[in-house]
Amino acid sequence: MTDSPLCGVIAAIATAIDATGEPNCAQSLALARFLLDNGCDGLNVLGTTGEGTSLSLRQRLAVMNAYAASGLPLRRLLVGTGAAALDDAVTLTGHAAALGFAGALVLPPFYYKGVSDDGLFATIEAIASATAAQPIPIYLYHFPAQSGLPWRVALIHRLLESFGERIAGLKDSSGDMDFANEAAGLSPRFRVFPATEAALPQARAGRFAGCISATANLNADLCARFYRSGDGAALAQAMAIRQLFDGKPLVPGVKALLAHIHDEPQWARVAPPLSPLAAADRTAAIAGYDAVRAKRVA
C-alpha cells in the first residue's frame, strides 16, 4: 500500500443532479477540475455534501467510474464508500481500490442505533479483509449527528492496533475539537481532517492533516491562501462565506451558491429527501457571498 498524500484543503465536493435524478457526471467533473485548479489540494467525492447516501449503489459506482476515466489525479481524491449494508460498503470500497482512489471514507452502518463497538469493529474488519489484495487506505467518517454512531477514540485505537496503516485517518464532522485533538494524538501517521476551515490554523501548525469542508466548494482559493501563506484576512473571508449557512440547510445552500458562482442554475438541484434552498435564503446567501467577495484580499 502506497502512502496517501492527502492533506491540506480538501473540498467535500457536491454532486450535480440532472432533471431525471441521475448524477450529472460531466458537470460534477467540471467542478472538480475547477476546484483542483483553484486552491484545493484534494477532493472528497460522494460524501455528505456529495449526497452519496442518497444515491444507489449503481449510481455511486457510475460516479466513481466517471472520475476514474476523467484523467483527474485519483491520488488526490478520497471517495465515500460507507453504507448501511455491509456488502454495499465492501463493493464500493473494493471498486475504489481497483480504480486507484487515494482512500475510502467509511461511515459506520447507520441504520441500527446503539450498536456496540464490537459491531463497528466487525464492519471495518470485513471491509479490510475483503480488500486485502488491494489495500486502499481507510478513513473513518465521524458524523454522529447524521449517522447516530460515533467512532469512539477507544475503538479507533483498537482499529489502529489491529489493522495498522490500513486505518489512515478520520474525517471529523462532529464539531467537537476536543475529540478531534484526542484522535489526532493516537498516532503520528493517523491523519485527522476536521470538517471546517476553522481548523486550518491547527493544520498549519501540524496538529491536523488539513480540513475536509463543504464550503470549500465556494471558498477554496481563500482557504488555500491561508493554508499556504498564513493570510489571516483570506481565512476571515473564507469563514464569512461558511457562516452564511449558519442555521440553514448546508448542502442545498452550497449547491445554490454553486449555481450562482458558475451561472449554472441546474447546480441548485438536490436529490430527495433534500429540498432546494428556500428562495429567501438563496437570495440572502447570494447577497452575502457577493458582499464577501467584493472585499478584496490584499
Provide a role label for each language-model segment.
Residues 2, 161-162, 262:
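Short, conserved catalytic or adaptor-binding loops enriched in Gly and charged residues
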Residues 2-148, 167:
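Active-site beta->alpha loop and helix N-cap motifs at the rims of alpha/beta catalytic domains
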Residues 11-14, 38, 207-208, 215-298:
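C-terminal alpha-helical cap/extension of soluble enzyme domains
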Residues 21, 59, 181, 274, ...:
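Solvent-exposed, flexible loop/coil residues
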Residues 27, 59, 119, 175, ...:
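Soluble or luminal CAZymes and related metallo-dependent hydrolases
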Residues 28, 60, 64, 89, ...:
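A general structural signal for well-ordered alpha-helical segments in protein cores
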Residues 34, 66, 126, 158, ...:
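Alpha-helical scaffold segments in soluble metabolic enzymes
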Residues 128-136, 143-249:
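Catalytic alpha/beta core domains of metabolic enzymes, predominantly
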